[in-house]
């Protein structure tokens, strides 16, 4: 597993089964987003695959599964700019951060856990792609009484936005509504709920979202072209 450095590394995680000397300090999680560049430009789908592979295999390198689960939830919360939630998750699991980042963490037994930077933020050279899902929008449901409700989404900028939604709506439709309201291109948006990425074809009713729940929207806006 790679440390938090400017480029990704192909290293396996340090097995935390053998406790190392724990750092003597614990710093709060820093709010700055880590910046890094991939060895090769990767698509959003490739980034998701790398993350899934890591989270699926990390517990196999010993350590405590509940700590890995907490780190995963904290990483998603931090990426969605919900640092209060991320810090609460870390505190609840008694996880300490010697340097204020999720790159290096310790549990209460002194076991060390390292997260690769690609699990904490997307690379600056991430390729934004228009997926087939965007062009193959599922057919509209049979017309019926539309029961709308206010859907709260929290942007990675920290702003909360309310959309008018109904359970049969797809994420792709709601992305376009957010674009109309806030001017954020649908291809820049990545929607997360309960730590899971929502695809454009996912309907709200499939997410089992309830009243007053919040969907996290991470915005990956491409940098302006350089002269």
Curated annotation (Swiss-Prot):
Annotated Ubiquitin-like domain residues: 149-224
Biased composition (Basic and acidic residues): 24-36
Chain positions covered by the region annotation Disordered: 1-36
Any matching Pfam family: ubiquitin
Self-association state and partner proteins as the record states: Interacts with UBTD1.
Function: May be involved in the regulation of cellular senescence through a positive feedback loop with TP53. Is a TP53 downstream target gene that increases the stability of TP53 protein by promoting the ubiquitination and degradation of MDM2.
Protein name per its UniProtKB record: Ubiquitin domain-containing protein 1
Gene designation: UBTD1
